[in-house]
């Protein structure tokens, strides 16, 4: 195991901001390489506990493929505190979500494929990977500079582009475990110990998983349109590991085992680790809906994340103590279709328009 401290910024008083990068050299050149990061959002700490479990596993069981692990991936966000709460979801300078600052790799495939399209598959993949990394380096070297969030994101993205498998470990506010999975990799969702999957289309919205898989998906589609069948060479997922501001080592062990189950399936490790048998459900990303508060007030969250909710069943109670005289101090809200609540807002005090819940609609069974 090798440990490097990678500079990703500086504070106003001159102190450097660095992230720890743990590397394990694989024993087989044929095995896929893996990049795993955690804690890009300051309050989403459980992924660090999962990486600790993986570190201990790889020390005892040398992997076949190269492994790069980056816990504590956002030192500025992690240290962005207000009283007892960690903020750290948005760059405090620009207000942009830390997980929306990655580079959109807008490769001009007409020109690039004309020069590289006849290369052997692995040679072509290597050339494309070098291009993606070079684009990140070019963006970092912009003579006009980059924002704090972009500097962090580009350094993380460079690391991710070096791998065949990219896992970004997050949590929700108050949340059940769920997985963001690209549509072309849906069969892999059954290996993680996660019951709910959001199926992602091709496209880029600024997040790490999209930054990792979207260029390769575009390359595959372009090659196929030119009569050459190319697989999507990179697999990328976002794992949402429950709720923020929470460390649970026993739960981290279960999540690490789910990751190892997937890595076993991909032959990154020599050990055979079977996925947990569970009911799994999915919906398309377009059917993952947000419910916004139609009124302000104090909220009693009634629907438990991860428990199916029938149409018309109580979702929340809204308390308005300014309406006691009118007898309308409690308003019960529900939805008009069957859903699976996935997460809800962390605070019980909300403005009108606050995102109260995210729910799966039009969901379907993946496996039993």
What are these regions (language model features)?
Residues 1-368:
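Structured catalytic-domain cores with a bias toward divalent-metal coordination
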């Amino acid at each position: 195991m090798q440990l490097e401290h990678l500079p990703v910024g500086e504070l106003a008083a001159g102190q450097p901001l660095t992230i720890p990068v743990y590397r394990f050299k694989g024993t087989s050149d044929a095995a896929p390489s893996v990049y795993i990061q955690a804690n890009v959002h300051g309050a989403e700490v459980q992924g660090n506990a999962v990486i600790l479990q993986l570190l201990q596993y790889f020390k005892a069981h040398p992997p076949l493929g190269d492994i790069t692990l980056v816990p504590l991936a956002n030192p500025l966000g992690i240290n962005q505190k207000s009283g007892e709460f960690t903020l750290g979801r948005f760059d405090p300078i620009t207000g942009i979500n830390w997980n929306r600052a990655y580079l959109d790799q807008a490769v001009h495939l007409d020109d690039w494929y004309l020069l590289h399209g006849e290369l052997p598959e692995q040679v072509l993949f290597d050339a494309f990977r070098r291009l993606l990394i070079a684009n990140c380096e070019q963006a970092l070297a912009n003579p006009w500079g980059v924002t704090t969030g972009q500097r962090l994101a580009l350094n993380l993205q460079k690391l991710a582009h070096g791998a065949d498998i990219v896992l970004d470990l997050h949590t929700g506010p108050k949340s059940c475990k769920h997985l963001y999975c690209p549509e072309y990799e849906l069969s892999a969702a059954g290996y993680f110990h996660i019951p709910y999957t959001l199926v992602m289309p091709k496209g880029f919205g600024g997040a790490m998983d999209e930054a990792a898989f979207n260029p390769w998906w575009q390359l595959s589609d372009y090659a196929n349109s030119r009569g050459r069948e190319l697989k999507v060479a990179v697999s990328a997922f976002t794992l949402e590991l429950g709720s923020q501001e929470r460390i649970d080592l026993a739960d981290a062990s279960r999540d690490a085992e789910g990751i190892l189950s997937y890595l076993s399936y991909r032959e990154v490790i020599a050990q055979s680790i079977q996925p947990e048998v569970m009911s799994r459900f999915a919906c398309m990303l377009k059917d993952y809906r947000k419910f916004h508060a139609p009124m302000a007030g104090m909220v009693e969250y009634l629907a438990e994340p991860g428990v199916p909710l029938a149409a018309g069943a109580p979702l929340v109670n809204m308390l308005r103590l300014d309406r006691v005289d009118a007898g309308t101090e409690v308003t019960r809200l529900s939805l008009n279709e069957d859903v699976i609540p996935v997460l809800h807002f962390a605070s019980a005090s909300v403005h009108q328009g606050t995102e109260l819940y995210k729910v799966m609609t039009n969901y379907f069974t993946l496996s039993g």
